[in-house]
Amino acid sequence: MDDTAPAVDSPSRPVPADAVDVALAQSGDQQAFERLYRAHVGRVYGLALRMAGAGPAEELTQDVFVRAWEKLSSFRGEAAFATWLHRLAVNLLLSERSRRGRERLRLGEDETVMDRQRARRETPEVAMDLDTAIGRLPDGARQIFVLHDVEGYKHEEIGEMLGIAVGTSKAQLHRARMLLRGHLEPGLKGGH
């Protein structure tokens, strides 16, 4: 799977064959669902990569499509299939984030922080690309950055999705941008 550039199709612009393939897939046609998968996997993977990081992105992408297959009968065509799939992906990724957060509390956050600091010290001369920098953000800041700056959600929508205040969303976005600037500036200054 190519993790360098996710597909750029907009969630509100339907792919012409989607309507036919959705109807066929809803009646059990696995080849039609495979076509839907191929048409949308890049965008879902890109979202998973940015929201969850490189490690779990591929597995989470598969989880999204398994869930889509299971819930396909609930798709009514009121929105484009891409929009429905995107919403399903965001919901699954947010649920996974909550689950991982609970696990981290049990295991201890200190190990994660130490690992990140060690990784920064070991490779300071390497210019970091944006995807890597986004992956290094703390979970909350990364989620909000991806939802707002990458996916185009408004702070009000993010607040509703995550169950947080609009002000918290804005503060986390500011934090994410400052952290990204800190991650990227050393590479920009030293590398060019």
Model features per residue range: what roles?
Residues 3, 26-35, 45-63, 166, ...:
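Short, charged helix-capping/linker segments at alpha-helix termini
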Residues 135, 139-143, 151-168:
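Helix-turn-helix DNA-binding module
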Residues 8-11, 99, 104, 111-135:
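Acidic, proline/glycine-rich intrinsically disordered inter-domain spacer in sigma factors
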Residues 2-9, 24, 105, 129-136, ...:
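C-terminal edge and immediately downstream basic/flexible tail or linker adjoining helix-turn-helix-like DNA-binding
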Residues 59-66, 79-91:
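Structural recognition of an alpha-helix C-terminal capping motif at a helix-to-coil junction
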Residues 37-55, 71, 134, 185-186:
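Amphipathic, Lys/Arg- and hydrophobic-enriched alpha-helical face
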